[in-house]
Every structure is written in C-alpha cells, then in structure tokens.
C-alpha cells in the first residue's frame, strides 16, 4: 500500500451503518429504524431553535454553561460535573481516547452498542466482548474478563438493541468487582423511558466513586436526534481529562438553545414517556398474538425474533420496507434472526402489526 497508512486497528473497524432513511418507489415512510422519539421535538425546543437563527454567525459558549445548569437543575446534579457533547457518541469516543489506548482492553456486553468496539479500536485498544445471559448484560461474565490490561467497561443500561436492563444492585455489584483503575462507563441513553422501580441510571455511583461516568442523550425522549446533543456526568478528574481532549466549540448554538428548552418542557417529556408505554404494550401484545417472539423491553423499541418462523428476518424487513416501513436488521449485533422496531404513534404501530401479519400469511 502506498501513501499514508492508518494507525493499527483502524482498518479493522467495521463502519457504523445507521438506520435507513428511504425506500425506492415509496413516498410515505414510517421511519422506525433509529429509535427516534415518536412525538418529534418539544414545541418549545423548536421555538428556541428558530429564535437563535440571527445568532448563528457567533461561536457558541464553549462550556455550554446554560445547558449544563439546566441539566443540573432538571436531574439534581452538580453542573460542574456535567459536560456536553456533539451527541453521546462523542463522549464515548473521547473516553476511549483518554483512558484506553494501545495495549489496553475495553470490555462490553456481546450485544451492546456497536460504537463501543469502534471507539476502542479507534483509540488503539482491543475490544473484548462478554457473553450475555438471556439477552441481558451478564455481570459475572464481564468481571471474569477483567484483566490487568482492562481500562474501560462500557455498559448500556438499558441496552440497545435488546431493550433489557441491569437492576441497581447488579450495576453496583459490577462496579464493586472492578479494580479502581478501570473506568465504568454507564451509557444511559434510554434512561428516561424506564419506569421499573429497581432501575438506577448510575448517577449515585458517579457521585460516590472516582471511576464511574454516566452518559445521556437528547436524541430519544427529547426528540433532538438531528441536533446531535449528549452529555456526561463525571467525577472531577474525568471531567478535567475530557475538557482537555474535546473540541473547543463542540455543541452548536442551536443545540444548546434547543436542549435548554427541551429540558424545561416537563409536560412534553411525560407525554412522550406515557405514549411510549402505551404503544410498546399494545404492539408487543399484538405481535405476540401473531406467534412471534418479542423480547421484553423498557425502551422505545422492541426486539422481535423471527427464528421460530423458519424464515429469515431480513425477508420480513424487506417486506415491511416495500410497504414503506423502515425497521432495523440486527445481524451486525450478532442477532441475525431479529428486527429492532422503534415505537411510533399507536396508529403507526397498528400498521406495522398488520403488515407483519400479512407477511406471516405469505
């Protein structure tokens, strides 16, 4: 190979492929492949976005001060330990850059978010996957793979794409089993959807220990996926390290304004959460009545398993796509028999269930 050569491991990265946005020959689409909020953004966020239009020639506040204060107020956190990013993907990468590296290992759950191994390899570290138990993070399996080379453990809680979660006591046990030098990163992107009493998003662990970080996003319940806005709650030393490696103006003027407004719209947040519960419960019941396996989920999506049909999940995906329904095939996550289906509005989910019923008859 002539010319510049990428660092070791870069060409081993399988590029991340997001959910589809179009279907040839189809004009009306139901986009249920990327776990976007069914209600879209808060009207207050849209208004705030429009209001900053005349100011987009100005650089944003590099510290995202108002947004960090709004996050602190909304979730009862110290704003000094909150950092904002261009989507939570950015902080997942920066943590690997700052704390992993050549010779280090990064642990994650077998069916965890694909960004974890990508971030590890991009930093020159080695990703190590631990098996799951019943499509749920297995604490014992993760701890069994901790070595002197382990630098980071990524845990999605709740997990994408399985929809499962670790109860608070299991998450605490995972942390207790890690050496102090290993950083536990709790990716709580779907935390706002969880109503289970035994769930914890990780903020209590961050408050008590120096080796835990929790990350969150505005892309799901808050409906700001197109803004690319995420944040992290960190120990002071980790916050200092991230400040040193992040881009100076990594969160746009528009994203900061929309984020503050979205946080203040509590009625919209509750309506989004309630609608998701309604849609997920009804859709799960209908699809199970068709004879398909729907794995339990606490998120704004469900994982549907087609193995028992004796037909490929990809066939079902293509059938849905031809009807303008875009869902996500899970082969890249090691779940080739499954489709992940985002929860839309109730009428939309009825349409999806009807289409699956038609496919099963074919």
Curated annotation (Swiss-Prot):
Recorded superkingdom: Bacteria
Catalytic activity: L-histidinol phosphate + 2-oxoglutarate = 3-(imidazol-4-yl)-2-oxopropyl phosphate + L-glutamate
BP GO annotations: L-histidine biosynthetic process
Keywords: Amino-acid biosynthesis, Aminotransferase, Histidine biosynthesis, Pyridoxal phosphate, Transferase
One Gene Ontology MF term: histidinol-phosphate transaminase activity
EC main group: transferase
InterPro entries tied to this protein: Aminotransferase_I/II_large (IPR004839), HisP_aminotrans (IPR005861), HistidinolP_aminotransfase (IPR050106), PyrdxlP-dep_Trfase (IPR015424), PyrdxlP-dep_Trfase_major (IPR015421), PyrdxlP-dep_Trfase_small (IPR015422)
Associated pathway: Amino-acid biosynthesis; L-histidine biosynthesis; L-histidine from 5-phospho-alpha-D-ribose 1-diphosphate: step 7/9
Record-listed N6-(pyridoxal phosphate)lysine modification sites: 220
EC number: 2.6.1.9
Cofactor(s) essential for the protein: pyridoxal 5'-phosphate
Pfam families referenced in this protein's UniProt entry, alphabetically: Aminotran_1_2
Covalent S-S links between cysteines: none
Family listed: Belongs to the class-II pyridoxal-phosphate-dependent aminotransferase family. Histidinol-phosphate aminotransferase subfamily.
Annotated NCBIfam families: hisC
Quaternary structure and partners: Homodimer.
PANTHER family: HISTIDINOL-PHOSPHATE AMINOTRANSFERASE, HISTIDINOL-PHOSPHATE AMINOTRANSFERASE 2
HAMAP family in UniProt: HisC_aminotrans_2 (MF_01023)
Name the UniProt record assigns to this protein: Histidinol-phosphate aminotransferase
Species assigned in the record: Rhodospirillum centenum (strain ATCC 51521 / SW)
Gene for this chain: hisC
